[in-house]
Every structure is written in structure tokens, then in C-alpha cells.
From Swiss-Prot:
Organism the protein comes from: Bos taurus (Bovine)
Matches recorded under Pfam families: Glyco_transf_6 (PF03414)
Known pathway: Protein modification; protein glycosylation
Residues annotated for Mn(2+) binding in this entry: D225, D227
Residue positions of the active site: E317
Coiled coil start-end: none
Function: Synthesizes the galactose-alpha(1,3)-galactose group by catalyzing the transfer of a galactose residue, with an alpha-1,3 linkage, on terminal lactosaminide (Gal-beta-1,4-GlcNAc-R) disaccharide borne by a glycoprotein or a glycolipid. Preferentially glycosylates proteins, can synthesize galactose-alpha(1,3)-galactose on glycoproteins but cannot synthesize the glycolipid called isoglobotrihexosylceramide or isogloboside 3 (iGb3).
Cofactors: Mn(2+)
Name of the protein in its database record: N-acetyllactosaminide alpha-1,3-galactosyltransferase
TM ranges: 7-22
Gene from which the chain derives: GGTA1
Protein keywords: Glycoprotein, Glycosyltransferase, Golgi apparatus, Manganese, Membrane, Metal-binding, Signal-anchor, Transferase, Transmembrane, Transmembrane helix
């Protein structure tokens, strides 16, 4: 090919490239340019911005608008996926009892909830629920095996569960064959001379374990006394951000009759005329973050009392009631979830989920 032919061919190639390029940048798809971010200081340091700054400029905001639409769709889908209280809870099913607090938190009674809706919702969330329990000294032989056996059968059936078992002698742990989706972790704790100190120090211990590992392992956490037995399904209807348990002996009483700590010197002090319910420290729970806050605040109160040489009337339970007075629980469990059969079985107790064991204090406690 002569020189003239080469020149003509080169001009044709260049013209073709220019035309293709011109058509491309004016098409909706013509936005895939890359420019070194270091040459565009306005873009800033964001790796996300670096990727889409020039395409957005070429397309006059086309990609930004598209992103806004996608974000709106994602937000809408997220809102639709959230479970509303009315989706699973009907307070009017039990008109004879209190089913809603003044601050609009549900009080869960048998008949007020739809567990199938909740099970389906939480299964999609792929939650794991934790349960802490303490057994020290003779509490191990008298209560731990029955507690764990019944929990294995009734607690959060169908969902992954981790039992966190705190004992002062690991060698005395009962052998329990756990069902599917269940596991346990056993931790040795330091024994205390008085049962009151064991009760109060558990707040510190639970908080330490939440910080160390529990917060990374579960979505919800319950803390329970070992001298109880599950009688029926204790399910996902109990889950919430901050969960308190009504005390079986006091759920019908006037707040002025509650056995709150009434001494002003105590950090757990609640004056007459104040208070909503009397809560039982045998069961409380929530998200790990909320349970951590509960345990830390209660332990602060306990330490303050020790410094002032005072001990609240009902120890950690007094401090728990003070906490829930100041920080209202987002869900409350009826006495059906922690019932004492010594009371009998009133008509409003439809289905007992968990019951107290016989309190053999003279046998299990070193100091009564």
C-alpha cells in the first residue's frame, strides 16, 4: 500500500473512533470512565465517591437518581419487614388483666399473642437466644439438672439457644443431652460466703460475660434463677429490647404495698407514691446491650450501698426494681411465666410456662 493509501486509511480509522466515541458518551450507557481519584481533589477520600464521580458528571445525575430510587425501595422493604405490635399482639383478648402499660409496653399473657407469626418472623431473622443461669454450692445438686432438662424441652423451641452456666465446681455439672440447635458453655465462678453476695455479684458477672463474648454470640439474652422449672413453651413472644417479669405474689397489689426499698440511704430507694409494678429478679432479659446496661446500673447501686454500709431489702431485686422504674421495660411478662403454685391457681393464670421450685433454704444456703 502506498503512502497516500495509508494516510486515507488512518483518517478513516480515526474518524470511526471519533464517531463511535461521540455516540457512546451521549448514550445512557456511556458512563464507564475511570479517572484516577488523586487527580480530582473535589471527590474527597471516599472510596464510594471515587468510583462514581465521573460517570455521574457525564450523565447529569442519572446514576444518583437511580441510587436514590433503589435506596427508597430498600427502605420501604425494610419498613414492610418490621414486625408491628398489632401483627402478633391483641391486648383485648384478656380484658380481665392489665395487658398494656401506661407507656404502651405489652404485658404478655396467654391468649394475647400469635406465636406462629413471631416464630416465622424470627426464623427469617435467624436469631440466637442466650440464657444465663447460676448454680453455686448445693444449688447444683438440688436444682440445676431439672432446670436445664426442662429448658432444653421448652425454652425457645425451634430457635438456636446457648445456655451459659455459671458454677463454682465444674466437676459437679450434670450430664444433659441437649436437643437440636442447643449448646451450652460452662464457666467457673468464685464462690461467695453469703448467698446474698452470690445473688448480687451475678450482676457483675453477667455484665463481664456480655462484654467478653455474649454480645457477639446472641441476639437476645435472658437471665434466670436456677430454682425454677419450665412447664410449657417459653417462646419468642417473650423477646424484646428490655424485658421484665411480674412477681407472682404482687401482680394484683397496690404499689404502696410493694416491698420496694424504702430507706432513702439506699441507691434502690423508691418512695411511697411511686412505682408501676413489682418485678421479679428471677427472670429478666432483652438485647445484650440492654441487659448489659441493666446489670451495670444495678451493680453500681449495689456498690454504692456497700460503700454506705447498707444492703437493700431484697438485694439485687430491689436494685432491679429501681432500674425499671427509671428505665421502663419495653415488654413485661405475666406471672404465668414465673408462677408459684403455693398461691394456688387463680382464673387469670391460664397456662403456667415456668414455676418456682420448693425453696429449701435450710438445705441449699450456708446462711439463712
Amino acid at each position: 500500500m502506498n503512502v497516500k493509501g495509508k494516510v486515507i486509511l488512518s483518517m478513516l480509522v480515526v474518524s470511526t473512533v471519533i464517531v463511535v466515541f461521540w455516540e457512546y458518551i451521549h448514550s445512557p450507557e456511556g458512563s464507564l470512565f475511570w479517572i484516577n481519584p488523586s487527580r480530582n481533589p473535589e471527590v474527597g477520600g471516599s472510596s464510594i465517591q471515587k468510583g462514581w464521580w465521573l460517570p455521574r458528571w457525564f450523565n447529569n445525575g442519572y446514576h444518583e437518581e437511580d441510587g436514590d430510587i433503589n435506596e427508597e425501595k430498600e427502605q420501604r422493604n425494610e419498613d414492610e419487614s418490621k414486625l408491628k405490635l398489632s401483627d402478633w399482639f391483641n391486648p383485648f383478648k384478656r380484658p380481665e388483666v392489665v395487658t398494656m402499660t401506661k407507656w404502651k409496653a405489652p404485658v404478655v399473657w396467654e391468649g394475647t399473642y400469635n406465636r406462629a407469626v413471631l416464630d416465622n418472623y424470627y426464623a427469617k431473622q435467624k436469631i440466637t437466644v442466650g440464657l444465663t443461669v447460676f448454680a453455686v454450692g448445693r444449688y447444683i445438686e438440688h436444682y440445676l439438672e431439672e432446670f436445664l432438662t426442662s429448658a432444653n424441652k421448652h425454652f425457645m423451641v425451634g430457635h438456636p439457644v446457648i445456655f451459659y452456666i455459671m458454677v463454682d465446681d465444674v466437676s459437679r455439672m450434670p450430664l444433659i443431652e441437649l436437643g437440636p440447635l442447643r449448646s451450652f458453655k460452662v464457666f467457673k465462678i468464685k464462690p461467695e460466703k453469703r448467698w446474698q453476695d452470690i445473688s448480687m455479684m451475678r450482676m457483675k458477672t453477667i455484665g463481664e460475660h456480655i462484654v467478653a463474648h455474649i454480645q457477639h454470640e446472641v441476639d437476645f439474652l435472658f437471665c434466670m434463677d436456677v430454682d425454677q422449672v419450665f412447664q410449657d413453651k417459653f417462646g419468642v413472644e417473650t423477646l424484646g429490647e428490655s424485658v421484665a417479669q411480674l412477681q407472682a405474689w404482687w401482680y394484683k397489689a397496690d404499689p404502696n404495698d410493694f416491698t420496694y426499698e424504702r430507706r432513702k440511704e439506699s441507691a434502690a430507694y423508691i418512695p411511697f407514691g411511686e412505682g408501676d409494678f413489682y418485678y421479679h429478679a428471677a427472670i429478666f432479659g432483652g438485647t445484650p446491650t440492654q441487659v448489659l446496661n441493666i446489670t451495670q446500673e444495678c451493680f453500681k447501686g449495689i456498690l454504692k450501698d456497700k460503700k454506705n454500709d447498707i444492703e437493700a431489702q431484697w438485694h439485687d431485686e430491689s436494685h432491679l426494681n429501681k432500674y425499671f422504674l427509671l428505665n421502663k421495660p419495653t415488654k413485661i411478662l405475666s406471672p404465668e411465666y414465673c408462677w408459684d403454685y403455693h398461691i394456688g391457681l387463680p382464673a387469670d393464670i391460664k397456662l403456667v410456662k415456668m414455676s418456682w421450685q420448693t425453696k429449701e433454704y435450710n438445705v441449699v444456703r450456708n446462711n439463712v
